[in-house]
Every structure is written in C-alpha cells, then in structure tokens.
A protein has these predicted regions:
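Short, well-structured N-terminal submotif of metal-dependent ribonuclease cores
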Residues: 1-46, 59-72, 128
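A generic structural signal for short hydrophobic patches within well-formed alpha-helices
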Residues: 17, 51, 90, 125-126
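Residue-level detector of anion-binding/catalytic polar loops
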Residues: 43, 81, 117
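Donor nucleotide-sugar recognition loop
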Residues: 98-103
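Acidic catalytic patch
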Residues: 71-97
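Acidic, PIN/NYN-like endoribonuclease modules and their adjacent C-terminal/linker elements
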Residues: 1-8, 77, 108-135
C-alpha cells in the first residue's frame, strides 16, 4: 500500500531516520518530510522499536551513529515524538500477516495503530497491504 493520510504526520522506520541523521541521500519526498519536521511543520513518530534497532546496529558497528547522537538530534527538533510499544501497538501488529520479520511488523504496527504513513525503503513493508508507505 502506498501513501497519504494526515499530510503532516508520519511514522519512521529505522533506516529512514538513520539515513536522515547521517545526512545521506534520500528521495525528495522523504527529504521534504524530514525538512518539514525540523522546521516545525510536520511531526514524525519514532517507534520504540526503531530506537532499539538503532542501539543494536550501533553496537554491531553497522551504522556510524551513536545513541547519544540520535538523542541529541531528537531533542534538537521538538517535532520528533518517541512512540512507546504498547499492547495496542502489538495488537495492531498482530493483524499484519504479510510482514514476517517481527521488528518490522512492530514498526509497521505502530503506523497502522496511528493510521499514519510509514517512511520506509524496505520492499517487504512497501508491499504490505496493511500499512501505507512513503519513500
């Protein structure tokens, strides 16, 4: 499923946020979303699972970001909102049958629960019929 709900609110997956904070190249629509967040014109929810994956990737040296750098970035811009993993999010994820990887399903479940588009470059998530995506 692709695009469009509340035009100024989104959920991000791990790589979307990593690529943005590392100032790596992003497609124009995604760059525009993150630019809007940082100018106060949009909100991006960051699922707890995204932060946990960032910890794991940093510890395994698969990304150059530290958790401290992530925290500083999120604190610098007030329109990033951490979103907790709750039973309601887990229930939303339980309905997603076409994303087999649990962590991805929990991130997609957050977007589904919030009824928001998910910023992701993951082809499995993009192909899902349960969540709308933007990339």
């Amino acid at each position: 499923m692709t695009s469009s709900t509340r035009a100024s609110e989104f959920v991000t997956d791990t790589m979307g946020l990593v690529l943005h904070i590392e100032q790596r190249r992003l497609p124009s629509p995604v760059k525009a979303i993150f630019d809007a967040v940082e100018s106060g014109n949009a909100t991006v929810y960051v699922p707890a699972m995204v932060l946990a994956e960032m910890l794991y990737l940093a510890e395994k040296h698969r990304i150059s970001l530290s958790l401290r750098a992530v925290a500083e970035h999120l604190e610098q811009f007030q329109h990033y909102r951490e979103y907790p993993m709750s039973f309601a999010v887990i229930q939303a994820a339980a309905h997603i049958t076409d994303i087999p990887e649990l962590h991805d399903r929990l991130i997609a479940g957050t977007a589904r629960f919030l009824h928001l588009d998910l910023i992701t470059n993951d082809p499995t998530i993009q192909a899902s019929t349960f969540v709308r995506t933007v990339w």
